[in-house]
């Protein structure tokens, strides 16, 4: 048995048959070729395993995000796949992203490293105040949340946007002028 690190050059692993293939930081992969080649390589192997280890990323058109969406469907029972073990560390949609105790859901090691959890508090405060790419990076890399974000957003303070929300339907605007 050998442990072999593979480069991103997928041509070098065509026909490769691993018992264990680990795709690390899948969010950074431009395409799904490495995953597909590993998947193809294990199909005739008994008890082979492919593991994808990654944080969330910035590209909602990436193969990693597509796999994430599929895995969420499996976890919710919308899709079925008994051959795949899925573990996604993330907060619930209703969780307040500024509550440090909620961060443990997205970053479970913080349960055992309370100093690291405390160290994240000023980082979060800075990200919230600065907005832009600093906030984006905090949300994606520390809270493991997928977001599509550009730095030239119209509304930088999402609290303002949230406070402006109203519960109206299109029917409420029938007959009204719209610009």
What annotation goes with each model-predicted range?
Residues 1-43, 164:
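Conserved RecA-like ASCE ATPase "motif II neighborhood" in helicase/translocase motors
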Residues 32, 37, 43-179:
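Non-catalytic, compositionally simple segments
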């Amino acid at each position: 048995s050998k442990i072999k690190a593979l480069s991103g050059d997928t041509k070098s692993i065509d026909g490769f048959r691993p018992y264990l293939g680990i795709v690390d930081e899948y969010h950074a992969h431009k395409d799904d070729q490495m995953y597909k080649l590993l998947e193809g390589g294990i199909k005739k192997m008994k008890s082979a395993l492919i593991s994808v280890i990654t944080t969330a990323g910035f590209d909602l058109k990436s193969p990693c995000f597509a796999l994430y969406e599929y895995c969420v469907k499996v976890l919710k029972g919308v899709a079925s796949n008994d051959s795949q073990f899925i573990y996604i560390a993330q907060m619930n949609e209703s969780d307040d992203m500024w509550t440090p105790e909620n961060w443990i859901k997205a970053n479970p090691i913080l349960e055992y490293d309370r100093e690291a959890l405390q160290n994240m508090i000023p980082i979060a405060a800075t990200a919230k105040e600065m907005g832009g790419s600093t906030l984006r990076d905090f949300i994606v890399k520390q809270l493991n949340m997928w977001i599509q974000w550009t730095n030239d957003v119209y509304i930088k303070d999402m609290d303002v946007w949230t406070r402006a929300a109203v519960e109206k339907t299109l029917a409420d605007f029938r007959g009204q002028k719209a610009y």
